[in-house]
Amino acid sequence: MAGSEGLMSVDYEVSGRVQGVFFRKYTQSEAKRLGLVGWVRNTSHGTVQGQAQGPAARVRELQEWLRKIGSPQSRISRAEFTNEKEIAALEHTDFQIRK
């Protein structure tokens, strides 16, 4: 899947107006378009968090999307990325919305 490019994993948390604006659905669609796996969910403190895995360049594309674009009605104030690392194999089989 990755060719000569390594796989990477990153955890993310996005703050701002990101709940009640279909942010999870749009994140799932964008991740699938990029061929990534992982998950996304709302938190009890009004943010959206998740994990994305796949070819490094594609994960970086999703990071930019999470920082600057999001869903049409969202207003992103901050996107934080943690636990960014190279991985030997994907740990998920799909990109899911978690409740």
From Swiss-Prot:
Positions of the catalytic residues: R24, N42
Keyword entries, A-Z: Acetylation, Hydrolase
Disulfide bond positions: none
Expression by tissue: Organ-common type isozyme is found in many different tissues.
Record bears the keyword Hydrolase: yes
Superkingdom, natural source: Eukaryota
Domain called Acylphosphatase-like: residue spans: 9-99
This enzyme's EC code(s): 3.6.1.7
PROSITE patterns, per the entry: ACYLPHOSPHATASE_1, ACYLPHOSPHATASE_2, ACYLPHOSPHATASE_3
Principal EC category: hydrolase
Matches recorded under InterPro entries: Acylphosphatase, Acylphosphatase-like_dom, Acylphosphatase-like_dom_sf, Acylphosphatase_CS
Catalytic activity: an acyl phosphate + H2O = a carboxylate + phosphate + H(+)
N-acetylalanine PTM sites in chain numbering: A2
GO molecular function, one term: acylphosphatase activity
Family: Belongs to the acylphosphatase family.
Protein name as catalogued: Acylphosphatase-1
Organism field: Gallus gallus (Chicken)
Gene expressing this chain: ACYP1
